[in-house]
């Protein structure tokens, strides 16, 4: 959601991140089990792959002048197909399950399993290590957006692209940076999911995650017109969406209605947000 927020702030969209998450998870598992690669090298290569994906998106959008919707929609289909082709649509895990063979560097893999999917005891509470990754990335991204000139450029680009360009901002570079960061964050998520799930399903890992991410970004205050949004709002919205999803399961509502209920809640939240913004604008105009 954080990566998608960066793209949306610039006025773009990314429909491919769910498939990027799935592809990174599959490639990591393939490197570790099939290729017997050193775990740190495998992680480095998969992260580099996610950076290249973002760079390709950015170049197609800025240099080939293809709409972000089209570029990332094609990416969604291509990356999912690659995941299924690479594994012949069979499950593959980065961490060996009972009876699994073919893993080199087993001790390193098990150590990384704790880093990416372990739990740290804090008193009577166990803190999942992925929560630390979320905290670090959220703080770093918030500082990037609010305290650096690059972050202000992203907001300026989303508010008025022509105005930003005429003021001397390299808008193409900023779009590329936003897309690269988005895919990089998706790559980190893919690694975390690979170790958390233990068994990667090429057709299902990351499925619909792009919709959850976009929903969290919009519900968290990012305008699809660009130029608005905060990382804190996005993180809170992502937590609320997960809470709603879990509540639906706990109450015992039919699983066939889960997406419908989630969609209605998000729609009502966005409508309420737009209503409040309109009222605040009218109040400020009346004071002026």
Segments the model singles out, each with a brief description of its role:
Residues 6, 30, 35, 55-63, ...:
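Membrane-interface helix caps of multi-pass small-molecule transporters
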Residues 1-35, 60-66, 214-217, 221-231, ...:
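Single transmembrane alpha-helix segments in multi-pass membrane proteins
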Residues 183-186, 196-262:
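Transmembrane alpha-helical segments in multi-pass inner-membrane proteins
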Residues 3-5, 47, 80-83, 133-144, ...:
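Hydrophobic core segments of alpha-helical transmembrane domains in multi-pass membrane transport
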Residues 37-46, 52-57, 61, 122-201:
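Helix-loop-helix "hairpin" substructures at the membrane interface of multi-pass membrane proteins
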Residues 159, 166-173, 244-288:
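Cytosolic-side transmembrane-helix boundaries in multi-pass membrane proteins
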Residues 19-23, 40-48, 70, 131-136, ...:
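Hydrophobic alpha-helical transmembrane segments
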Residues 69-147, 176-177, 196-202, 282-288:
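Transmembrane helix-bundle core of multi-pass membrane transporters
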């Amino acid at each position: 959601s954080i990566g998608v927020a960066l793209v949306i702030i610039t006025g773009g969209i990314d429909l491919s991140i769910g498939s990027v998450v799935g592809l990174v998870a599959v490639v990591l598992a393939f490197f570790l089990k099939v290729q017997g690669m050193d775990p740190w090298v495998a992680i480095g290569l998969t992260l580099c792959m996610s950076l290249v994906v973002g760079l390709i998106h950015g170049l197609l959008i800025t240099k080939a002048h293809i709409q972000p919707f089209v570029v990332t929609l094609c990416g969604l289909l291509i990356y999912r197909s690659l995941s299924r082709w690479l594994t012949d649509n069979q499950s593959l895990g980065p961490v060996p399950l009972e009876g699994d063979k073919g893993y080199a560097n087993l001790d390193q893999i098990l150590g990384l399993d704790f880093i990416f999917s372990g739990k740290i005891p804090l008193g009577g509470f166990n803190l999942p290590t992925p929560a630390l990754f979320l905290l670090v990335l959220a703080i770093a991204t918030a500082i990037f957006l609010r305290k650096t000139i690059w972050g202000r450029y992203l907001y300026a680009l989303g508010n008025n692209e022509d105005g930003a360009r005429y003021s001397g901002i390299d808008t193409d570079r900023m779009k590329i940076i936003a897309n690269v960061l988005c895919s990089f964050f998706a790559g980190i998520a893919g690694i975390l999911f690979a170790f958390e799930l233990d068994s990667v399903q090429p057709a299902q890992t990351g499925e619909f995650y792009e919709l959850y991410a976009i929903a969290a970004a919009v519900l968290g205050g990012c305008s699809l017109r660009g130029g608005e949004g905060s990382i804190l709002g996005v993180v809170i919205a992502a937590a609320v969406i997960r809470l709603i999803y879990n509540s639906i399961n706990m109450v015992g509502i039919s699983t066939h209605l889960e997406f419908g209920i989630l969609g209605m809640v998000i729609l009502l939240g966005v409508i309420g947000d737009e209503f409040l913004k309109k009222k605040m604008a009218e109040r400020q105009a009346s004071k002026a």
